[in-house]
């Protein structure tokens, strides 16, 4: 499956050459920055980007009805990349793509590299969950493990991500330089420290806190890599003063994705379920009291917690689907008392210790945690 830049409601044509395009963007056709009767603008990543919401919904719910519905699309996107990628030596390379609309012919755009990884991981996990296409998983895993690494460059004495391996190196607007971090989800607090340092450097260099339609990914990306929480909140406060009450940016005629910027950023700061580890208050100023109720994270867990006087005062996790849980001990290496409840009945009480608690959970069960006396 290969999609153009945009798709409209059934009956609305969004890809063919039009009088509007000929009037205002005729030069794009003449310079071959956009296809005549196509409107892909050189990009091969659009269908993979469409998988983002499907992937998020799948990992946060683990409800079989949903992957049954979307799996054919996700598999179709994976099939495109299986055919389109070029294997050179021990790595897969992406040729003739575009990191930004119209940057035709670039090699290994960093967004596509992140999205392809996400697609292959998602389609494989969906196939396991649904019990289908087991003969395809080896190829999907091979692509995941052998696709090119993220291109790098030096800017102002720092190593940062390069937008492509060959072609566009940097862009002064939007946030495609960090979207392999979020929403593609390929870098997080459990990533290699050197990769996290490069990600920090890139956020420092980009500074896209108030971007036309990219802030919605820039803020969560900063959270995912553990950027300074006070800085994030200062910038988020300024951003929120540049929106309508519903989150739509002032003077921005498009970009409904910006509705998510503030709540999504705050949620990720308070509770993060990423890279198979649930963390509470992972990127939140410890001196700021805060609480949250049933934030949904990967694994189909609903998490509630409170931070008071610099310490986690309470933590409760409801398991919808009975998935395995790995919880980063919010009290560091202190011993923790866990109680397991189901239908108002206490099933188990035990003491836990260690940096990360690994456990099996029961569907419909609640797990409460408090530091042991």
Task: Set out the residue ranges of the language-model regions.
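Aromatic- and acidic-residue-enriched carbohydrate-binding clefts of CAZyme catalytic domains
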Residues: 3, 9-35, 102-105
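Extracellular structured ligand-interaction cores
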Residues: 47, 91, 178, 300-302
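Short alpha-helical basic/polar micro-motif
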Residues: 71-75, 79, 264, 303
């Amino acid at each position: 499956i290969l999609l153009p830049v945009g798709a409209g409601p059934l009956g609305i044509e969004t890809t063919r050459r039009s009088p509007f395009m000929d009037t205002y963007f005729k030069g794009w056709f003449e310079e071959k920055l956009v296809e005549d009767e196509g409107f892909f603008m050189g990009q091969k990543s659009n269908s993979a980007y469409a998988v983002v919401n499907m992937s998020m919904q799948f990992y946060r719910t683990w409800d079989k009805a949903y992957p049954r519905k979307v799996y054919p699309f996700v598999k179709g996107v994976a099939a495109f990349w299986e055919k389109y990628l070029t294997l050179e030596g021990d790595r897969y390379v992406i040729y003739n793509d575009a990191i930004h609309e119209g940057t035709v012919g670039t090699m290994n755009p960093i967004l596509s590299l992140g999205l392809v990884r996400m697609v292959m991981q998602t389609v494989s996990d969906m196939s396991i969950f649904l019990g289908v296409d087991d003969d395809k998983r080896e190829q999907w895993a091979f692509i995941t493990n052998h696709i090119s690494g993220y291109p790098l460059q030096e800017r102002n004495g720092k190593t940062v991500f390069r937008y492509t391996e060959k072609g566009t190196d940097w862009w002064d607007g939007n946030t495609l330089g960090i979207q392999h971090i979020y929403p593609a989800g390929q870098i997080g607090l459990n990533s290699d420290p050197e990769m996290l340092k490069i990600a920090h450097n890139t956020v420092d260099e980009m500074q896209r806190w108030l971007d036309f339609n990219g802030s919605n990914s820039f803020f969560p990306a900063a959270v995912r890599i553990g950027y300074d929480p006070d800085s994030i909140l200062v910038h988020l406060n300024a951003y929120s003063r540049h929106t309508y009450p519903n989150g739509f940016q002032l003077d921005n005629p498009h970009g409904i994705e910006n509705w998510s910027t503030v709540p999504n950023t705050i949620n990720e700061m308070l509770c993060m379920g990423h890279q198979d580890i649930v963390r509470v208050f992972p990127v939140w100023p410890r001196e700021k009291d805060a609480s949250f109720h049933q934030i949904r994270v990967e694994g189909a867990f609903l998490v509630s917690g409170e931070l008071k006087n610099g310490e986690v005062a309470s933590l409760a996790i409801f398991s919808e689907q009975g998935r395995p849980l790995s919880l980063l001990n919010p009290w560091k290496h202190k011993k923790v008392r866990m109680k397991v409840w189901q239908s108002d009945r206490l099933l188990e009480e035990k003491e836990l210790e260690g940096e990360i608690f690994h456990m099996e959970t029961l569907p419909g069960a609640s797990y409460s945690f408090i530091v042991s006396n």
